[in-house]
């Protein structure tokens, strides 16, 4: 390794595991845990019986499917049941979802393995060994998490196997009833059908199937799919339209009270003193609590004072009226300018962790003066808030040694653990109901709001309490997408060929903070998210180095939709355009040259460019190509500039996500990702001054409005490859695509987000 620290073998392995939250130290490498049957019963109602840990069946033939992932608009309540319905040969309408119990069989193995810091082209023994170990550890940890665009990817095998096994058990039960061979039976539309025409409905076979020994369990081939790969309507849409869908904020346990909080305006500040005498006389106010005394350390929950009242309005008005003196603490002078200055200083002094290298960059740089052209650029990205439509909320009741919890969470396991920790009860005494989420985007991976509401409910005399943060609370007390500073340098020969490519960036590390807040583990090791999308890109240069410097962050950091890809794609795809311009080449042709060994990437790029066609007069097309979460996305943004206003009219989005389980939700996620990413590209910025977040609501943290949203055209390329992620991959390319179009129109290279002229 030249020009950057070479990681030791041990550090590399442990660092890779650290970013996934799975630390191998102390774990034995045990045989793979069977994912078909767990240690907890599938929660079924009425006459339902469980055929395995994932699938149950009622006498009326309805199928119950365990749902270990949270529905937050990405369509898992449709896509995951499709996997079971396909293998069981039942219509999707016959399947209902039930909340999966906290059990290791539902752990998200794919997300943890995807967090390892290896290049996609790496076929070495270290990668295969570490991936194998992580798979073992992940099975034992059983972390039930919705994130990393991994829901379908992780469920692809276990849920299909659960469905196929259930079908085989039903066939065995029917064969026994008829005293026939299972080989002479087939299944169709919820029935087992014998070759002679006899048939039995699944419901009639349910009880006997429980004890039936399945014969051969065979998964369908793609050629046999009737549901998978065919567009299916979202099953959660009707309830969201008619208002019957239950989100966290809709929880209404009997006798529920409401809580509003005041938290320190300065990051890390504490409560000094509170004068609540007048507040206690206000209408509906039941209690004022400083919950810090019952809140354990390292839960991520912000210190503050809560008002418990009969309505949220009463609680909020009383909270605003409280006289609180704050102890601001050591961060009262913190500013965005100081944070970026610290990044720059660290980049000047430290070599950083080298994620990828090829050739000899030191030799290239030493000869840079003799080459045709040398290029340097510095890019930056700000902190970002999540701004989910449903504000942060959670409902809890602490009574008789138990905790009842209603939570719109992406991390059910963490929610149960922190609730038990705060309440001082065993985890098995926590009863969790996971509601729908009005947007997650990574914010609800953290469980600080769970810790906060349980602490408040512990002081509420047994009443259930619903905690609601206002938009201002949410914006000023988020766990933010890290700010980042990246430096690029490259050398080109007289023919425009890139001789060397170097990228060195600096930012905080999400995993270090997340591990402390949610696992109680000390920070350490590399964090793949800091360099993802850059070190693992598919552009190849003979001499290349990608490194990152972790700078400890006082600002709370959290996972944000597409995580490090959200800024690294902007940096990388913008600089690739700079290289194309410096080489005197068309930006698309330049990319094609670099992707000569990657036909799937080329196909995606070509599909987007062909569909986009020529830009109309007065507009320009900007192009970006990026792979994240296993999915390749190319976007062409059609942009105009009027004065200082950047307007995006149309976006063509081409996708290769492997086998498209439900093309309908894939297209929806592409549209959603474009708009989400465009909001960040044009408007998103959280700034710090005097230790405080300056933004508070949509007036100063705007998102794309309906009249600003572009037309989005989605192309899904056919593929038989393993399904990959789709919840996030459409987010990263939009910012560089727009920036590259602006350069064509104005000749001005925009290297900072949000994009401004």
Predicted segments, located by residue:
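Cofactor-binding beta-sheet edge motifs in enzyme active sites
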Residues: 2-757
């Amino acid at each position: 390794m030249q020009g950057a620290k070479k990681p030791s073998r041990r550090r590399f392995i442990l660092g890779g595991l650290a970013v996934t939250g799975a630390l191998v130290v102390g774990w034995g490498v045990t045989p793979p845990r069977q994912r078909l049957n767990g240690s907890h019963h599938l929660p079924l109602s009425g006459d339902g019986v469980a055929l395995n840990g994932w699938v149950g069946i009622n006498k009326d033939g309805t199928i119950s499917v365990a749902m270990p992932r949270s529905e937050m608009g990405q369509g898992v309540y449709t896509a995951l049941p499709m996997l079971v319905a396909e293998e069981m040969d039942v219509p999707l309408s016959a399947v209902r979802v039930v909340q999966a119990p906290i059990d290791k069989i539902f752990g998200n193995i794919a997300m943890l393995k995807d967090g390892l810091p290896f290049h996609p082209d790496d076929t070495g023994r270290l990668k295969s060994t570490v991936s194998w170990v992580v798979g073992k550890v992940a099975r034992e940890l059983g972390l039930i998490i919705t994130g990393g665009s991994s829901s379908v990817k992780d469920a692809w095998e276990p849920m299909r196997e659960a469905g196929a096994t259930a079908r085989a058990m039903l066939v065995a039960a029917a064969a026994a009833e008829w005293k026939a061979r299972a080989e002479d039976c087939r299944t169709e539309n919820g029935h087992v059908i014998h070759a002679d025409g006899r048939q039995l409905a699944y419901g009639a076979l349910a009880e006997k199937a429980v004890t039936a020994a399945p014969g051969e369990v065979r998964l369908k081939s793609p050629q046999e799919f009737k549901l998978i790969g065919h567009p299916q309507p979202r099953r959660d849409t009707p309830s969201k339209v008619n208002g019957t869908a239950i989100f966290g904020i809709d929880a209404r346990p009997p006798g529920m009270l409401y809580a509003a909080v005041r938290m320190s305006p300065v990051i890390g500040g504490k409560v000094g003193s509170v004068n609540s005498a007048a507040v206690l006389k206000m209408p509906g106010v039941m209690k004022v609590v400083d919950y810090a005394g019952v809140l354990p350390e390292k839960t991520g929950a912000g210190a503050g004072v809560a008002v418990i009242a009969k309505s949220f309005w009463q609680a909020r008005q009383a909270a605003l009226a409280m006289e609180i003196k704050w102890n601001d603490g050591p961060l009262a002078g913190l500013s965005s300018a100081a944070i970026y200055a610290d990044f720059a200083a660290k980049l000047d002094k430290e070599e950083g962790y080298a994620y990828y290298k090829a050739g000899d960059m030191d030799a290239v740089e030493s000869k840079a003066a003799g080459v045709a052209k040398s290029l340097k650029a510095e890019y930056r990205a700000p902190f970002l808030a999540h701004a989910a439509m449903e504000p942060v909320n959670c409902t809890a009741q602490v009574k008789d040694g138990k905790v009842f919890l209603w939570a719109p969470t992406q991390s059910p396991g963490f929610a149960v653990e922190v609730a038990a920790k705060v309440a001082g009860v065993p985890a098995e005494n926590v009863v969790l109901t996971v509601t729908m989420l009005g947007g997650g985007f990574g914010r609800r991976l953290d469980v600080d709001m769970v810790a906060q509401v349980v602490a408040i409910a512990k002081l509420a005399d047994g009443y259930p309490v619903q905690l609601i943060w206002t938009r201002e609370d949410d914006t000023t007390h988020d766990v933010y997408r890290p700010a980042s500073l990246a430096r690029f340098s490259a050398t080109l020969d007289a023919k425009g060929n890139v001789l060397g490519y170097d990228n060195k960036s600096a930012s905080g590390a999400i995993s270090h903070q997340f591990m402390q807040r949610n696992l109680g583990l000390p920070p350490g090791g590399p964090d793949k998210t800091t360099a993802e999308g850059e070190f693992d890109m598919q552009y190849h240069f003979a001499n290349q180095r990608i490194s990152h410097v972790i700078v400890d962050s006082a600002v709370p950091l959290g996972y944000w939709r597409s995580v490090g890809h959200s800024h690294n794609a902007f940096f990388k795809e913008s600089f690739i355009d700079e290289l194309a311009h410096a080489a005197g080449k068309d930006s698309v042709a330049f990319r094609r040259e670099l992707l000569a060994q990657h036909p799937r990437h080329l196909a995606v790029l070509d599909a987007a460019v062909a569909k986009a066609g020529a830009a109309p007069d007065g507009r320009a097309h900007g192009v970006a190509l990026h792979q994240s979460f296993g999915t390749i996305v190319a976007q062409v943004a059609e942009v105009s500039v009027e004065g200082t206003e950047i307007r995006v009219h149309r976006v063509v989005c081409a996708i290769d996500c492997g086998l498209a389980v439900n093309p309908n939700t894939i297209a929806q996620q592409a549209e959603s990702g474009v708009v989400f990413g465009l909001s960040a590209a044009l408007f998103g910025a959280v700034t710090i001054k005097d230790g405080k977040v300056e933004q508070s609501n949509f007036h100063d943290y705007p998102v794309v409005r309906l009249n600003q949203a572009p037309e989005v055209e989605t192309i899904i390329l056919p593929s038989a490859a393993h399904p990959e992620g789709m919840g996030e991959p459409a987010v990263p390319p939009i910012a560089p695509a727009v920036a590259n179009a602006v350069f064509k129109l104005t000749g001005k290279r925009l290297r900072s987000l949000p994009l401004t002229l």
